[in-house]
Amino acid sequence: MQNNASFFLANITSSLAAKSTSCLICFAAKPHFSAKMWSIELTDLIPGLPAELGLECLTRLPYSAHPVASRVCSPWRTLLESQEFYHHRKKIARTHKVACLVQALPRKLVASESDVPKSTESPSFGITVFDPVSRSWDRLDPVPQYPNGMPLFCQLASCEGKLVAIGGWDPVSYSPVTDVFVYDFTTSRWKKANDMPSKRSFFAIGSDAGRVYVAGGHDENKDALKSAWVYDVRLDEWTELTQMSQERDECQGVMIGSEFWVVSGYRTESQGVFEAGAEVLELGSGRWRLEDEAWEAGHCPRHCVGVGEDGRLVSRGELDSAVRVGTCGVILGGGTLVVGSEYQGSSQGFYMAEGTKGGQNGKLDRISVPDEFSGFVQSGCCAEI
C-alpha cells in the first residue's frame, strides 16, 4: 500500500513542478473544479494541496492506472469509483474511447500422429480491448462464472465507463442464458447483475444515458420476438418497453442520437429472409415508429450497420472487398475499427477507417495485430472510460 502511494505521489509531484502560478489561477477560476460542488469528500486527496489541485492531479491519471490508484487509500478509491468522477472526467475531455470485442481465444494445440499440431476443442471467446490511440491490445479477465470463455454470442454495450455483457449461450451446453455481467474498468472486476427477464438470442442492443436497450431476437424455441426491455445500470433493474409492431430475429441495434434503431431481422415463418425495414424507439416518448426501406432486403445486418454521411444506414461490408465477409465495425471517436474477411474461410483483417460514418468516404488503414489477438471477432462495442 505504501509503495503504491509513494509511486503515485512522486509522479504527481513531478507533474505539479512543471505547472506555473498561472495554472493555479486557471484552476481556481473554473467552476467545475470547485470542491463544494461535489457530493463526496474531496479534502486531503493529496496532503498539502488544495482540493481542486488534488482532483486535477487524479483526473489526469490514465484510465489504465485507476485499478492501482484506487488501492492507494480510501479517499482515492471512493473518488475513482464514483460516477461523479467519471462524469467530471468526461466533461473536461479526460475520458478515453476503446473498442471492446468478443473475440475467439487462441486454441490449445496438441501434437497429432502426423506431427502437425491441431486444436483440441471448439473456440472459446474472451473480451479483447483495443486502444486506437496507442494501437495496443489487451484482454479482460474472464467472468468468474465462465472461466473458460464468455457465453457464445453474448452481446456487449457500454454505459458510464462500464462494460455490460448480456445473454448468449452456455459455452458447454449451448443452452441460451439470461446472465448479465458488468465490468468496472476502475476496479478491473466483473460483477454479476440482475438476469435478463427472459431467454433471447441474436437480439438488437444499444445503450444511452446509463441504460441498455434490447429488442427482438428469438427465444429458446427459436421463435422470433418483438418484445423489448431496458436495463438501468445504476439501479440494476429491468423494465419492459412497448413491443415492436413485428417480430425481428437476428436484427441489429444502432443508436442514432436519442433513438434506438432495430434494423432488419426476420419473422418466425420467414427464417433467414431479412426484411428491408427498421423500427425506431424514440427514447423520450418511449414510442416505436416504422422506417420502411431503411435496409437492403435479404442482407444480414448483424454487426455491420453504419450510418452514412447522408444519415442513411449503410453496410460496412461494402466499404472494401477486404471486409465484405464477417464484418464488424466499432465507432471510436474520429475513426471506426472495421474487422472482416475478403471471402468465407479467409483470415480476418483489422483496419481503421477515417470518420465516424464507418469510413464511407475514407480508405481503410490496416492494423498490425499480435497473434494472440488475431482471432475471429464476433461482435463489439465502444467503451468510453
Model-derived features with residue positions:
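Kelch-like beta-propeller repeat domains
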Residues: 2-385
